[in-house]
Amino acid sequence: MKRKNFAACALALALLVLAGCSNSASDSKPDTTPQATPTAEAANGKTVSPLPSGVDLQHLNDCMVAVSFDKGDAFVDGKGAMQLKVKVYAYDAFDTVDINKLQVGDQITICQQNVKVTSLEQDKNAAVLINGGADNGGYTLVSGEASGFYAVGPNDTKLYYALGEATIPVSSDLVLEDSSDLEKGTRTYYAGDFLTDGSGLTYHFVPDNTTITIEGGYVTHMQRVYTP
């Protein structure tokens, strides 16, 4: 009888030991629950994008755009209509709130390029200098427009980038107001002056100084201004 009781007790003790081992193994099992990983914004900073330019190469019907073109890009087509082949440009404008929140470690898209912000400061004119500013290989943002800040180059003119090319019909009433030469003052040219060598028109039409106005799909006005 004692032997039976001893066997029963031994069996019960063995079961308790096994149960204890099972719980211990469960408690020490590595935690395989997936851990949260930093988002791109948390790890690399946020990305500040410019406001939409509003320029659509496929619908240049009623707008004013910065352009460049060379001698010979104004021509008469096979149907007798004057055309102007241009490169169309845009510049980046940024919301003031976005620029005020910009920090070192963020990225900002300028001229369709993502720029890592490694240094950030403000000069005495309240211009925002990114990575040393335009004079030191970086970028300079200035305010002064309703849209907020925009990027400028070393000569303080807007920093343009090309969107593409377009050939646009020219109105017979086209007027060019040319004030690119301070010594000569403002001069006026007309559509036909682009088609002749005797007009005295000089060719330096670049986005820094030239804009065209398009109305109803036709170039109706052009302005060229002085740039330093």
Each model region followed by its residue ranges:
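Bacterial N-terminal signal peptides that target proteins for export
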Residues: 1-9
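Repetitive helical segments and hydrophobic/amphipathic motifs
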Residues: 11-13
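Conserved nucleotide-sugar donor-binding catalytic segment
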Residues: 27-30
